[in-house]
Amino acid sequence: MSEHVGARVIISGKVQGVFFRAETQKAAKGYGVVGWVRNRTDGKVEALMEGLRGDVEALIAWCGEGSPVSRVDQVDVQWKEYSGKFTRFEVTY
């Protein structure tokens, strides 16, 4: 049986103003991952992801590549317990 996990992910680089959040949302839907993504005031992007471990890992790997016009310098991951409280993946503000 596959394990459900959660992850808090911080992405650094040229990740704001380059459609990173919208593309992350699209990728999350493709992987079946739920949660949210938002810009931070420090220029980074933060996401909270939940789903099957392999799907969350795939979305984290996607974040390392980013959207076509972004430049990802670093991806920091903090694994969390699966809460099950999300039903979709949203861009938040």
Feature map (PLM): residue ranges:
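Intrinsically disordered, low-complexity, mixed-charge
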Residues: 1-93
